[in-house]
């Protein structure tokens, strides 16, 4: 009787092992995927089947404050060919991601038809997020600097006054863009003390600031220059 029970358990174990799928590379790494409404376990189907990872539609690429790491084996192999993404909204990451979706990249110019250097970006796509904002995006998103203000669910008409003078206000250097899920929040203590002069923004919002290598009180010198540029 015990022998029969043992054989049954052994057969069940063999069946479980042989029927289990080979685990694929999941989205992970040092930086989280950023989205306004949250993305969670982003693409179950994509993580399960590597071959279908490139069938993901949507207007925007994956975003991470400090990079996602090796997102997908195949996409991350040829480093020299990873960055050929068209459209105004590039793949944004502190350490870069690479050529993520072949199909999405072929149609990137259409998918990313948002004016300005700071596009709407989302891991699984947002759609036409701001009807009014997109119509006037060239004026609203005219922000200079190495990284655009990015939000998973969009920022909308971010700072009326600030965007009019964005070229002077946002001339901030550094390794990574300012990224927020649904706003910017309490950015830099020192900078926020002078925010009324520098950016005319109300400090607050639910989304923390993220950057490729962290921000903290990041660039004192550029913040000092921002105040002088507004003078």
UniProtKB/Swiss-Prot annotation:
Residues 28-201 are annotated as: 6 X 29 AA tandem repeats of [EG]-G-P-G-P-V-[IV]-[SG]-G-S-G-I-G-[ND]-V-W-[NE]-K-A-N-E-[QP]-A-[AE]-[QEH]-Q-[EQ]-[NS]-I. The keyword rRNA-binding does not apply. Residues 1-19 form the signal peptide. Residues 107-126, 134-231 are annotated as: Disordered. Resistant to heat. Keywords: Allergen, Repeat, Signal. Sequence repeats lie at residues 28-56, 57-85, 86-114, 115-143, 144-172, 173-201, 204-231. Residues 114-123, 143-152, 177-187 have a biased composition (Low complexity). It comes from the Eukaryota. This is Allergen Ani s 10. It comes from Anisakis simplex (Herring worm).
